């Protein structure tokens, strides 16, 4: 009888160990978005993050969750390996005095950090800290500019995982230019805008051991319908989470329904 109980305990322990090992391998990614603050189909933070979360979840061992604003419950941050800001001025969200201690702890732990479009921005009080965290800083009130153009999205480093699985293409986008960058930040994507070449995306390997990725596109919701557009962003987010990106790029399958936007409650009936 004792041997039977011992054998059962060993089997149970084996399966519990398997479950624990599986949980440990899950890479949790948190996408921070917000409610609309632009015209319909522009800066659709929540809908665009939902698309990215669906795509991220197609990579084995990865789970992604969207939060409207910084999570109020600290438990939501437990086990998170990478954070993505697709929101108004991500730097001011991350370094808000109410969450700054959390942010600094996460950065010291080497968490992956990504920012998309206006998420690359920060107001002046958070600017320098954001620059040191992301490697780049957008602020149209102080030094940056933006304009809508159709131009070729170019790969500055085709061998980088962010460039896996897609080819250069023409993209109509609201491009940000004249950002501040750390010398160590490395351009990954670029575009020629009004006859001058500018970075469109960059990577930065932080001294704390974490990886950061900035992508300046993302103004127009329609662009998330482009496979190559989604793949570059998803590849970049996975890279910050230290997930191996396959040579053909990350899977980014979506449906036409995924691109549908909810009604705009701001619109008068």
Predicted feature residues:
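Catalytic beta-strand/loop cores that center a nucleophilic Ser/Cys/Thr
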Residues: 57, 65, 136, 140, ...
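Bacterial N-terminal signal peptides
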Residues: 5-17
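Glycine- and acidic-residue-enriched helix-capping/strand-helix junction motifs
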Residues: 36-50
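A short, well-structured beta->alpha microelement
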Residues: 60-73
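Solvent-exposed loop/turn segments at secondary-structure junctions
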Residues: 35-39, 70-72, 88-93, 113, ...
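Extracellular ligand-binding/catalytic regions of CAZymes and related secreted enzymes
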Residues: 22-27, 33, 51, 58, ...
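A glycine-rich, often tryptophan-bearing local segment used as a flexible ligand/cofactor-contacting loop or short
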Residues: 32, 90-164
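Structural recognition of the beta-strand scaffold that forms the well-ordered cores
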Residues: 28-33, 64-66, 81-87, 107, ...
């Amino acid at each position: 009888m004792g041997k039977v109980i011992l054998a059962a305990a060993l089997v149970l322990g084996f399966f519990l160990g398997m479950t624990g090992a599986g949980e440990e391998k899950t890479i949790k990614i948190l996408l921070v978005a917000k409610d609309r603050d632009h015209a319909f189909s522009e800066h659709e933070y929540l809908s665009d993050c939902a698309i990215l979360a669906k795509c991220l979840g197609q990579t084995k061992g990865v789970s992604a969750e969207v939060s409207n604003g910084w999570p109020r419950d600290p438990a939501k941050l437990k086990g998170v390996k990478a954070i993505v800001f697709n929101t108004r001025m991500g730097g001011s969200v991350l370094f808000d005095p109410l969450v700054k201690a959390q942010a600094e702890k996460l950065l010291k732990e080497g968490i992956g950090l990504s920012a998309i479009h206006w998420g690359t921005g920060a107001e002046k009080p958070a600017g320098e800290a954001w620059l040191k965290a992301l490697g780049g800083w957008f602020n149209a009130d102080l030094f940056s500019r933006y304009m809508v153009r159709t131009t070729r999205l170019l790969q500055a480093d085709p061998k980088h995982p962010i460039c896996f699985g897609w080819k250069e293409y023409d993209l109509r986008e609201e491009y940000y230019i004249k950002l501040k960058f750390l010398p160590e930040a490395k351009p990954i994507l670029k575009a020629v805008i009004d006859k001058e070449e500018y970075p469109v995306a960059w990577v930065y390997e932080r001294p704390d051991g974490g990886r950061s990725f900035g992508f300046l596109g993302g103004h127009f919701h329609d662009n998330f319908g482009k496979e190559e557009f989604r793949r570059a962003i998803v590849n970049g987010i996975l890279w910050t989470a230290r997930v191996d990106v396959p040579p053909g790029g990350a899977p980014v399958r979506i449906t036409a329904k995924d691109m549908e936007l909810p009604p705009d409650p701001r619109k008068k009936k």
